[in-house]
Curated annotation (Swiss-Prot):
It is an enzyme of class 2 (transferase). NCBIfam families: PRK05182.1-2, PRK05182.2-5, rpoA. One of its GO terms (molecular function) is DNA binding. This is DNA-directed RNA polymerase subunit alpha. The gene is rpoA. One of its GO terms (biological process) is DNA-templated transcription. It holds the Pfam family RNA_pol_A_bac. The N-terminal domain is essential for RNAP assembly and basal transcription, whereas the C-terminal domain is involved in interaction with transcriptional regulators and with upstream promoter elements. It catalyses: RNA(n) + a ribonucleoside 5'-triphosphate = RNA(n+1) + diphosphate. Homodimer. The RNAP catalytic core consists of 2 alpha, 1 beta, 1 beta' and 1 omega subunit. When a sigma factor is associated with the core the holoenzyme is formed, which can initiate transcription. Residues 1-238 are annotated as: Alpha N-terminal domain (alpha-NTD).
Amino acid sequence: MSLKSLLKGFKRPKKIEFNTEASTPNYGKFVAEPFERGFATTIGNSLRRTLMSSIEGAAISAIRIEGVNHEFSFIEGVAEDVTRIILNLKQVRIKYEPEEKDQSKIIHLELKGAGYFRAGDLAVDSSIEIMNPDLHIATLNEDANLVMDLEIQRGRGYVPAEEKKKDIEVLGTIPVDSIFSPVQKVVFEVSETRVAQRSDYEKLTLEVWTDGSVSPDDAVAQAAKILKEHLTVFINFEEELEEEDDELDEADEKLKASLSKHVEELELSVRSLNVLRSLEIDFIGDLVKRSEEEMSKSKHYSDQCLQELKGKLSTLGLSFGMRDF
């Protein structure tokens, strides 16, 4: 069975609505509709789990401090002990794009005298961007001489320090718990939506928060690609996959032609045309997106006009409140 035949009759979103007004580098809201009942929950939950666990990011994986052999040490001239410094370093959010895949980076720091060690001090070159540069790491007095190396790696999810101990080669290197995931929170909501006269379809609203090293829309796109690649192994009709998913059948072509017509082609009365002009509706596609309540806002509106418009749309198999095209 071809992919086109397999999907016949299924209502699926044609595009994702991205709320640009509310979006920030750390937050994005996405709306997709319509879905057949049950599909919005399935897709929303799958995207949420993938976003939280499988998007790649960067984090500090190990540190080495001159004169320190283990994490339960104190450093002369530094108020915080090594354990507290490590806890603070775990919170640093980093954007790092290596020149070569799986390439780690060593940052060398030398801090002398009184002052504050903040996350922004780790941005030693253009390949490193710190997303929370004001994060406090340590307080130094005039006797301080803090010399340290930090290793930055890319990865997925959460990797505890215990798993890294076997890879430590340099004496005095302390492995650090790494939170690689740039996605901090994902919430999805499923609600009912109407398509023509049916109100039993579903709308998926997805909200994504990141640390800024990856934009929310990029994170969603990556999650969708990961899911897609995992599902292809279950497909055993490869030839059908080559067909264009969005290929329009004859009915779709007819609908597209109707929606692109100018409203004057409906041969309406002057009063009804005035209603459409006052609402700046020029094409049938614009008209069917409106609700009956929206139409009543025109000063030329009358029940007779509404009935005429509904009748004309009905002859084309259309109605008010259509959004699925």
